[in-house]
Amino acid sequence: MEEDIDTRKINNSFLRDHSYATEADIISTVEFNHTGELLATGDKGGRVVIFQREQESKNQVHRRGEYNVYSTFQSHEPEFDYLKSLEIEEKINKIRWLPQQNAAYFLLSTNDKTVKLWKVSERDKRPEGYNLKDEEGRLRDPATITTLRVPVLRPMDLMVEATPRRVFANAHTYHINSISVNSDYETYMSADDLRINLWNFEITNQSFNIVDIKPANMEELTEVITAAEFHPHHCNTFVYSSSKGTIRLCDMRASALCDRHTKFFEEPEDPSNRSFFSEIISSISDVKFSHSGRYIMTRDYLTVKVWDLNMENRPIETYQVHDYLRSKLCSLYENDCIFDKFECVWNGSDSVIMTGSYNNFFRMFDRNTKRDVTLEASRENSKPRAILKPRKVCVGGKRRKDEISVDSLDFSKKILHTAWHPSENIIAVAATNNLYIFQDKVN
């Protein structure tokens, strides 16, 4: 994946697979840490699996930077809200890393209601020679203690521990859809359908409500919050998107409750494209600031749009992800696929964007050359270190040998979650219960 998306130079490795997928094994979020050395995935079973990149070896060039399992832990358990008689799923909705400050790693994970701060650390020594406890940790009889011992640290096999350091609960009435760490690294926000809360990492029993769009009469509700993110450099600025296809940029310096936006991004609808499904497919499923902070990228059902922060009336770029599905919206509505929430990501230099589609396809768009490519993440078509071939979807008429008909697309195979290494051309793609890593091929 050079800057012009040279698909001839893509190879892949296959990381996580269960031949017989259960609902709990389906990957629900993927996220690289700030250095790209670690890659975290969360699944519907409430588990977090962290992969660590291998150090490059001169005598094994083909194993350049492969990722192996580093730690696995149960982040969330299923719960029951007795006041509302509602089950709370253990599914991990989002994972966000904090920048590394010391030898340990910290990450946030959230399900529908509760955000947790996890510390992931290594141990390769253990203390021995306590005076009041024996080697098993049991208290010794003081009468048997005749000498004073100085405890010592003994080497042991490397062990990776994940411990919950903070639990942020009881602040969301509705389902959490986004968490975002602020650039001050002291605060973060969590967003649900109607509210956005601001948290301090040190305070778990109190949060500040910074956005509240809940009407006094719920019958007047016309839109919900679908995603939210802090600006990468300005700690006072954040954006949130809505189910109406609008994006609001807010400045926390203006007021404590950001009920008035600073900027409002919306593209006027083309009357010729108006249909029963217009409002559904215009709902934004993901919003991402570029690394530079100059642009916002949004994903709706059929397109990816790039907005300049200085121009609110229309996007500067619009990319068709799978426009061939426009004629299939009726059947996609009937099987609920039209409500799928696809994510989108930038590459490290903001020059290429990536998002998922159906049939285990994912799309890449080069913003400079305007070239795009469709690739497939599947076991049948991609063995480890094999070169990926571009795929094409045929709409009616004659179908070429290397094309796939739009009628034969498998809508149960979908790529909703992807991640891009912060500085290298390495991507992670979650296809149901399988995780794929794709990278530049070594020449």
Curated annotation (Swiss-Prot):
GO BP annotations listed: apoptotic process
Gene Ontology CC entries for this record: cytoskeleton; cytosol; mitochondrial outer membrane; mitochondrion; protein phosphatase type 2A complex
Single GO MF descriptor: protein phosphatase regulator activity
Tree of life domain: Eukaryota
Keyword line: Apoptosis, Cytoplasm, Cytoskeleton, Disease variant, Membrane, Mitochondrion, Mitochondrion outer membrane, Neurodegeneration, Phosphoprotein, Repeat, Spinocerebellar ataxia, WD repeat
Positions where Phosphothreonine occurs in the chain: T298
Modified residues (Phosphotyrosine): Y295
Residue positions, PTM Phosphoserine: S275
InterPro entries recorded: PP2A_PR55, PP2A_PR55_CS, WD40/YVTN_repeat-like_dom_sf, WD40_repeat_dom_sf, WD40_rpt
Sequence ranges of the WD repeats: 22-61, 87-128, 171-209, 220-260, 279-317, 334-375, 410-442
Expression sites by tissue: Brain.
Record has Repeat as a keyword: yes
PANTHER family: PROTEIN PHOSPHATASE PP2A REGULATORY SUBUNIT B
Main function: The B regulatory subunit might modulate substrate selectivity and catalytic activity, and might also direct the localization of the catalytic enzyme to a particular subcellular compartment. Within the PP2A holoenzyme complex, isoform 2 is required to promote proapoptotic activity. Isoform 2 regulates neuronal survival through the mitochondrial fission and fusion balance.
UniProt disease annotation: Spinocerebellar ataxia 12: Spinocerebellar ataxia is a clinically and genetically heterogeneous group of cerebellar disorders. Patients show progressive incoordination of gait and often poor coordination of hands, speech and eye movements, due to degeneration of the cerebellum with variable involvement of the brainstem and spinal cord. SCA12 is an autosomal dominant cerebellar ataxia (ADCA).
Self-association state and partner proteins as the record states: PP2A consists of a common heterodimeric core enzyme, composed of a 36 kDa catalytic subunit (subunit C) and a 65 kDa constant regulatory subunit (PR65 or subunit A), that associates with a variety of regulatory subunits. Proteins that associate with the core dimer include three families of regulatory subunits B (the R2/B/PR55/B55, R3/B''/PR72/PR130/PR59 and R5/B'/B56 families), the 48 kDa variable regulatory subunit, viral proteins, and cell signaling molecules. Interacts with TOMM22. Interacts with IER5 (via N- and C-terminal regions).
Family to which this protein belongs: Belongs to the phosphatase 2A regulatory subunit B family.
Domain notes: The N-terminal 26 residues of isoform 2 constitute a cryptic mitochondrial matrix import signal with critical basic and hydrophobic residues, that is necessary and sufficient for targeting the PP2A holoenzyme to the outer mitochondrial membrane (OMM) and does not affect holoenzyme formation or catalytic activity. The last WD repeat of isoform 2 constitutes a mitochondrial stop-transfer domain that confers resistance to the unfolding step process required for import and therefore prevents PPP2R2B matrix translocation and signal sequence cleavage.
Protein name stated in the entry: Serine/threonine-protein phosphatase 2A 55 kDa regulatory subunit B beta isoform
Organism: Homo sapiens (Human)
Gene transcribed to yield this protein: PPP2R2B
